[in-house]
């Protein structure tokens, strides 16, 4: 179509835009986005990320760390890491995905081929998470089904799995719910270890398969499969329920918790500041690792979820809002947890230090014990485990979606064909389920602890975070990435973010990583069982299998490249030319919020800037 523009001789000068290769690449990018799929609206993205990052660690890890590390004083190192590491790295990963429209592996390959190993390392961590994280859902489902009885089975000592050492009330000092005296154990502990786990003497004896847990695990995988099998447009609808329902449960449990006798004392223990604890480096390490755990940083999930955003989505504002939402949820969850623990402390007549637990001990020992002391105990048990299931469910299927995204983006020709995605998801689910059966054997808890302590540890995440921020801020260029972000959102983010990328984040992460190594202590199950030497070797193999991806990929890339070392290095730090390039401003003082990218699909072959201020 021939377009003629009649312009008055006194009118402002016209600037014609001749379509070049960059516009063709942009059009190809739009077509690729259609092939990959995009979020229907911003809320789907926000809820999907919220579902991923707001999980079990918000409920069972943060409150205990806060109590253990000086109460309110713990917020000092927590918020230092929050602003200097949490928000900057979180935003970096989301912006990287949105800018490249690629999953974790191919995003790093396009922006800085030398550091493609960062993406591969995140895929390794995602794979481990897909195997072991869902085991928690199987346990929670087992407890939920066990709650539909006239009397909760962990209330009494008259069940077939109880031993002669079971004692219904351990009120005396030194016999809390998670501990045992020389001769006695509690019914809730025996239900957990003998009925649910059937735990053996050690990792050398895996024992038989716990078929009830295997069925619960199968149910969890079936639900996860159907939550993501049709792509992000379908997943975006699922998270409207799975990401919001836990908040309803949290509010109900909060109201119930703060109305219990003894709740005030528990909350005081949770928040009472002990500033002397800030002298302990362990407090700072716990704050840093908690930020990386709860924000799902360096796991590839944020990059994958961001890749389904529209190019001009304001990912900066979204990232800040999601980070604050995550921390606020952790803070509120602390009131739920410690109001109940305060109630337990008063009912049993023991110090709160003897009932305070973290991790599985809180979810499957402390809380089940607490609900037995409440009226309508079956109701509160059901509500609590439903909340746990939904907190874990969306974290699990979103993590699964991110692994699928990375795989499809690596092999688009093979896996983007009709029906291939569903088969890929099915294959991954079946494989992870079969491997997961090892974790629901009678000795499976020992394997679970290895995964949790080594495979997805803070050491791995801190290691990868250093390479992430260094590759973007120092190799690709912080100013260049800021230009890309400005092209996407229309303005440049707060300068502190760039300063953090350049100095604060790599410095703090490296210091915390080195301190974590220096303070390393071998895993002990229940602080008692010592693993055999080969067990620790397996654990460190799980840890190094992800971290080793970065240096190995650097070496392999340098060996495969052609030319001198300098030429090879230059090739490997050069971004892919197909990436969107910031457009040149055709005005002198026009607003920063305007979209400066020409769209040949919408404007035709000639784009005319009718108004200038020249």
Swiss-Prot record:
It is a multi-pass membrane protein. The keyword Disulfide bond applies. Keywords: Cell membrane, Disulfide bond, Glycoprotein, Membrane, Neurotransmitter transport, Symport, Transmembrane, Transmembrane helix, Transport. SUPFAM superfamilies: SNF-like. One of its GO terms (molecular function) is gamma-aminobutyric acid:sodium:chloride symporter activity. Residues 574-614 are annotated as: Disordered. It is found in: Basolateral cell membrane; Cell membrane. It comes from the Eukaryota. Its main location: membrane. The chain crosses the membrane at residues 45-65, 73-92, 117-137, 211-229, 238-255, 291-308, 320-341, 374-393, 423-441, 458-478, 499-518, 538-556. Residues 138-210 are extracellular. GO terms for biological process: gamma-aminobutyric acid transport; glycine betaine transport; neurotransmitter transport. Glycans are attached at residues 171, 183. PROSITE patterns: NA_NEUROTRAN_SYMP_1, NA_NEUROTRAN_SYMP_2, NA_NEUROTRAN_SYMP_3. Residues 1-44, 557-614 are cytoplasmic. It catalyses: 4-aminobutanoate(out) + chloride(out) + 3 Na(+)(out) = 4-aminobutanoate(in) + chloride(in) + 3 Na(+)(in); glycine betaine(out) + 2 chloride(out) + 3 Na(+)(out) = glycine betaine(in) + 2 chloride(in) + 3 Na(+)(in). Disulfide bonds join 157-166. One of its GO terms (cellular component) is plasma membrane. InterPro entries: Na/ntran_symport (IPR000175), Na/ntran_symport_betaine (IPR002983), SNS_sf (IPR037272). Transporter that mediates cellular uptake of betaine and GABA in a sodium- and chloride-dependent process. May have a role in regulation of GABAergic transmission in the brain through the reuptake of GABA into presynaptic terminals, as well as in osmotic regulation. Probably also involved in renal and hepatic osmotic regulation. Belongs to the sodium:neurotransmitter symporter (SNF) (TC 2.A.22) family. SLC6A12 subfamily. Interacts with LIN7C. This is Sodium- and chloride-dependent betaine transporter. It comes from Oryctolagus cuniculus. The gene is SLC6A12.
């Amino acid at each position: 179509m021939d377009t003629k523009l009649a312009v008055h001789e006194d009118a402002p000068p016209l600037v014609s835009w001749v379509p070049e290769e960059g516009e063709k690449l942009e059009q190809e990018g739009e077509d690729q986005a259609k092939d990959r799929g995009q979020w229907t609206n911003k809320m789907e993205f926000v809820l999907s990320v919220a579902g991923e990052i707001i999980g079990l660690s918000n409920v069972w890890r943060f409150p205990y760390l806060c109590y253990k590390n000086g109460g309110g004083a713990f917020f000092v190192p927590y918020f230092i890491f929050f602003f200097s590491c949490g928000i900057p790295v979180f935003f970096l990963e989301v912006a990287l995905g949105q800018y490249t429209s690629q999953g974790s592996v191919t995003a790093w390959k396009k922006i800085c081929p030398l550091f493609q190993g960062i993406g591969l390392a995140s895929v390794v961590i995602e794979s481990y998470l897909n195997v072991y994280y869902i085991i928690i859902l199987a346990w929670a489902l087992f407890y939920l089904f066990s709650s539909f009885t006239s009397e909760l089975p962990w209330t009494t000592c008259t069940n077939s799995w109880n031993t002669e050492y079971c004692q219904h009330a351990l009120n005396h000092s030194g016999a809390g719910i998670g501990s045992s005296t020389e001769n006695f154990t509690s019914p809730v502990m025996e239900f957990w270890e003998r009925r649910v786990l059937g735990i053996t003497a050690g990792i050398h004896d895996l024992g038989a398969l716990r078929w009830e847990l295997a069925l619960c695990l199968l149910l969890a995988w079936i639900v996860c499969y159907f939550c993501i099998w049709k792509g992000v447009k379908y997943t975006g609808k699922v998270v409207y329920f799975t990401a919001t329902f836990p908040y309803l449960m949290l509010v109900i449990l909060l109201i119930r918790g703060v109305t219990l006798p003894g709740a005030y004392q528990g909350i005081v223990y949770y928040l009472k500041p002990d500033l002397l604890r800030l002298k302990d480096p362990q407090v700072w390490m716990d704050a840093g690792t908690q930020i990386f755990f709860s924000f799902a940083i360096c796991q590839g999930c944020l990059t994958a979820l961001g890749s389904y955003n529209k190019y001009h989505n304001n990912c900066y504002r979204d990232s800040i809002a999601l980070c604050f939402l995550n921390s606020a949820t952790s803070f509120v969850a602390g009131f739920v947890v410690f109001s109940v623990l305060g109630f337990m402390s008063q009912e049993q007549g023991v110090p709160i230090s003897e009932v305070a637990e973290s991790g599985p001990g809180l979810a499957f020992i402390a809380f089940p014990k607490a609900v037995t002391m409440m009226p309508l105990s079956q109701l509160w048990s059901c509500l609590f485990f439903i909340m746990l299931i939904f907190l874990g469910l969306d974290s699990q299927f979103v993590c699964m979606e991110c692994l699928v995204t990375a795989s499809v983006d690596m092999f688009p020709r093979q896996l983007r064909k009709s029906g291939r995605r569903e088969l890929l998801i099915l294959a991954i689910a079946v494989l992870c389920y079969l491997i997961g059966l090892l974790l629901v054997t009678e000795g499976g808890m020992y394997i679970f602890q290895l995964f949790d302590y080594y495979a997805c540890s803070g050491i791995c995440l801190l290691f990868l975070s250093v390479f992430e921020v260094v590759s973007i801020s120092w190799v690709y260029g912080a100013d260049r990435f800021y230009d890309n972000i400005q092209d996407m959102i229309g303005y440049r983010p707060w300068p502190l973010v760039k300063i953090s990328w350049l100095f604060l984040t790599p410095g703090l992460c490296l210091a915390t990583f080195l301190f974590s190594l220096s303070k390393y202590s071998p895993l002990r199950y229940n602080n008692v069982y010592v693993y055999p030497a080969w067990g620790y070797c397996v654990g460190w193999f799980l840890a190094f299998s992800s971290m080793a991806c970065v240096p190995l990929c650097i070496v392999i890339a340098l060996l495969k490249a052609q030319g001198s070392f300098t030429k090879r290095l230059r090739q490997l730090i050069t971004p892919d030319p197909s990436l969107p390039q910031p457009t040149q401003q055709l005005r002198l003082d026009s607003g920063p919020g305007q979209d400066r990218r020409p769209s040949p699909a919408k404007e035709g072959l000639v784009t005319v800037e009718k108004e200038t201020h020249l």
